[in-house]
Amino acid sequence: MVVRSAVPFTVAELDRAAELVGQFFGPTPQYAWPLLAEAIGAEVWVKHENHTPTGAFKVRGGLVYTQRHVHDSTADGTVRGLISATRGNHGQSLAYAGRAFGVPVTIVVPHGNSPDKNAAMRAFGADLIEEGRDFQAAREHAGALAVERDLQMVPSFHPDLVLGVATYARELMLGAPELDTVYVPVGMGSGVCANIAVRDLLGLDTEIVGVVAERAPATALSFAAGHVVNTDTADTMIDGVACRAPDAAAIEAIIAGAARIVQVSDELCADAVRMLFATTHNMPEPSGAVALAGLLAERDQQQGGRVGIVMSGGNIDGPMLAEIMAGNTPAV
């Protein structure tokens, strides 16, 4: 039985968010690929968030957040600038939105971050700073810089980010036949919380299943414990879900509305990247394939069903792509 959660926005707010996002790009496709159905033994609808202008779902949240906060920060009614931390897609999202609304954006990334994602953030206009050994360290540095430079710190999880991201869940759930289960990647939680909220807003019986990396299990541990559990490391090639300090509000919503959290290995995620390329002719980044990895882990229980997976992004580096397509799993 599906457990309902408190929906953080109204239908009217979701419609307005969809209108705003629609000023920048149209709905992304959702397709039921026949080769993928043959491979899984179920009807599988893929939500192609790799088809947004930034190649990932987070641009939706960036647009809604920036539009809502562009007049928040100073006495003269203008934002001095936004700052945040990212492994890539959140930063591209804010850089894209900042350019759209005329707001300067500073992004902090950890050392060793994807060169291609760094280049994309700079191309969208971000002032990029490299600091810290991982995402959490970069986030702490961004918070300090926000105070030092009088910038508005954009969190990785916020109700307005969830509202923006919910526009893709709305497209999927209204555009596909009713799904038994939707598998969603979980980093800081905006995607899974958005799917839970839209499912409940539409009164559907779809299970929402979050997928995380075995080597970044903080959300899975938090879900099992019923409260936030941090980890010391999140060393996974699936960089978009490399979270070691979950957001408390996100965990509360996930506990209230998700059916379960599935942990997958880097090796299974690499298999999922290759399978998506072979069956859909799309190339996901690892976090864009991790939802399929979750489905692969539960393939036996989904036989003959109708499921959705979120291909959350396609921003993969060339060297990583070459290694995965050669049949390997990149080392971290």
Language-model region placement:
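PLP-dependent amino-acid enzyme catalytic core
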Residues: M1-V332
